[in-house]
Amino acid sequence: MQAIAVWTLALAIGQTGSADDAYFEAKIRPVLVETCFKCHGGTKVSNQLRVDSREALLKGGKNGPALVPGQPDKSLLLKAIRHADEELKMPPGQKLPAHVVKDFADWIQQGATWSTSGKIHFNPRQHWAFQPVKNAPPAEDPSGWANHPIDRYIAARLCEHGLKPVEPADSRILIRRVTFDLIGLPPTPAEVEEFVIAWDAASAKPQAAWGKVVERLLASPRYGERWGRHWMDVVRYADTAGDNADYPIPEMYRYRDYLIDAFNADKPFDQMVQEQLAGDLLARQGQPDKFAERVVATGFLALSRRYATAPYEFMHLTLEDAIDTTGAAFMGLTLRCARCHDHKFDPITREDYYGLYGIFASTTFPYAGSEEFASMKLPRQHFVPLAPNAQKIMADYRQRLKELPPQIKKMEAEKGNKQAQEKLNALRAEERLLHRLGLPADVPGAYAVQDGTVVEARVHLQGDPDKLGPPAPRRVPKFIEGKPVVFPADGSGRLQLAQWLTRPDHPLTARVLVNRVWQQHFGQGLVATPNNFGLRGEPPSHAELLDHLAGEFVRHGWSIKWLHRYILQSKTYQLASNPTGGLLAKDPNNRWLGRFSRRRLDAEALRDAMLAVSGRLDLKRPGPHPFPPIQAWGWTQHNPFKEIYPSNHRSVYLMTQRIQRHPYLALFDGPDTNTSTEKRTTSLVPLQALYLMNDPFVREQAEAFAKRILALSPESERRIAWAHEIAWGRPADKVEIAKGVDYVNRYKHELKRTAESGERLELSAWTSYARVLLTANEFVFVD
C-alpha cells in the first residue's frame, strides 16, 4: 500500500529576522498551505506554478514570475488574489478576505522574506473538514444589528469586508419566500393578509407572527413533499433501474413516500442515515410496526444504478455507485477517486475504498429486470417482503413454483380436452406471473437490499475487477475513523458503517447536512460544493457558522425542523433582496450574505404553483405509477422503456427515469437521476419562454385560473385585483388594474374579428391575461 501522501515542502532559506519569520509563519504560510498548495504544491502543479518556495514564486509559471519582492503592484501573486484580472483570479470563484490580501501586499512590500524554520509539513489530514466540529461562540456585533447567533457570525464577515446588510424584506415578500421555501407552494391571499396584519400592526410582536407562520408550514403535509424532493436529488432518485433498457421499478414509490413521511415526522437525521444504509437489519431488531418502513428505507442503496443487459452484469459499477453516493450524500467526499489508486487530494487510500466495497459486496441487491428479462424468461429477484414473518409465505411461494411445471407437463399431455387446455393456459399464466414478480402476488414488497454472503474484497488493480490485488478487509476510511469500528463475521457491516457515520463526534455528517439545508434556504451553501468537503472542494465562506450549526444540530437531536426554525428566525434570512450601498458591486455573488438572493422557482415549485393558482392541484398522494402489467414487459436497449404519466398531483410524484429525462423537468433544470445532484443549475433560456407561451399544460392552467377569476365577480377591476393577489401574493395597484382592464378589453376586441363571441370570447380574453400573470417574473421568481 502506498503511504498516505504527506507533502514535505522544501523552502529556500533566506536572510531574515525573527520578526519577519513570525509574520510569514502567522499570516502567509497558513494561507499558502490551506488555499494554494492543493493546486500548486506537492504532486499537483497547475499552470507550471509552484508556491512551495520563494525561488518557485520568483520563477513563476506560464504567466511569468509570480513574485517581485518590494513591488506588490508588479507581483502576479497579488494581482491574482486581488481578482484584479478577469483571467487571473485565485483562488477561483471566491476572493480571499480583504485583510488577507493586505497581509500579502505588506509581505511583498517588505521584501517577501521566507521563514528560516527549514521545512513545512502539509498533511491532508489537517484539512478543516476532517477536524472536530468547534462550536465557538460568535463575537458581539458592535453595530447592534445582530442579536441572533447566526446574525453575529454574518455581521462579523460583512464588517470584515466593509459591507452592511440591507433593510428587512416587506412582510408580503417574507411570507411568499418562506412558504415556497418550506412547502414549495404559494401562500393563499388569506394567509398573506393574516400575516401582514400581524406583522405590520403597531402593537404586534413581528417575530411572534413569523414564528406562527413557520410552525404552520412545518406542520403541513406539504412540507415533507418539498423537503423530501430535495433529498431525492441527493440520492439520485428514479423510478427506473438505469440498465440499457431502463426497466421500471413499480415498488420504488415506497422509498419516495418513506422520505416524505420521514421529513414530515421530523425523524432524527441520524436515524434516517441508519435506516437508509441498514434499515433491513434494524427492522429485525425493533418493533414490528416499524419493519416495513425500515426495509423500504434501504431503497437508498437499492437505487444504485444497473448497467448493460444481463442481471448483475458489471455489478462492480453498481457497487461503485453505492459507495460514491454514500460518500457524497453523508460525508461530502468523492470516494470514487480512490477506486484505481490512492486519492490524489484527500487522504483516502485504495484500502479504504475496497474496505467499503466489501461492505456493499456483502449485500444482496434486487434485480428489477433488463433486456434478458423477457428473452431468457428471467424472474425479478431479491425483492424484500414487507412482513416481519414472511418466511412461511415465501416458502409456500417457492413450493408453488416447484409444483407448477409438473402440473403444466401433465396438462400438455391431455391433448384435445378443452377443459384441460383452459386449465393449462391458466397454469401457464400463473407460472409466468409468479415467476416474473419475484414475490407472491398478494405480498407487498420493496425494492430494497438485504445481507448476503460476507465478502472480504480484494483491491482491483487499476480499478479492473479482473485484476485482483491484495485483500482489503472491510473498514471505514482510517483517517477519520476515530474509535475503531469492529465489523461482524456474520453480517455485511452496513449497520456498523451507519452507526459510525452518525457518531456525534463525526467531523463530516452533521456539517454536510446543515450545509444542504442552508443551501436550500439561501440558494448557496456555506460550502459551495455540498458533495465535496475535501481538499478540492470550496472552503466554507463562514467556517465558524458552519460549525456552530453542526454542533447545535446534533445537540438538538439531529432535528431538521429545529434547524429550519433556527435559521428562519435570523435577520439574515429576513433581509430584502435588493442590494443597496454598493453591495452588488462589492459582493456580486452575495457570498457574505448582506442581502437575500433572488431565485427562480425550481421546476417542481413552478409547476405546482401553476396548478395551485389554477385550482387544479390534486393534493392526494397518488401511490404507485400505472406501469404496464409485468406480463407485458420486454424492453430492450434498442426499445427501452419510455413513458410520461400526466397528472395534476404535486411534481414530487411525477415518474422519473434514468435514460429518458422527463421533458419538463429537463427543460427547467430538474435533477440528473443518474448521479447525486449536489446543486441544481438555474438557467434562463428561450426554450423555457416558448414552453410557457405554448405548452398545453400552461394553457390548461391559465384557462382554469381564468374560470376562477370570472366566477369571482362581474367587475373587471375586482377580477384584476384578485388575480394579482392569488398569483403574485400582493394586490394590484391602480396602474396595474387600469392596464389589466385595457388589456382584456383590447383582446376581446381583437377576438371579435375571429367571430368568437359570448362566454367563449370572455374566457379566451381572461385566459390570455391569466397566462400573462403565470409567466411574469413576479410569479416565476422569489425575492
Model-derived features with residue positions:
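Primarily interfacial, aromatic-capped hydrophobic alpha-helices that serve as membrane anchors
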Residues: 372-405
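Globin-like tetrapyrrole-binding proteins
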Residues: 769
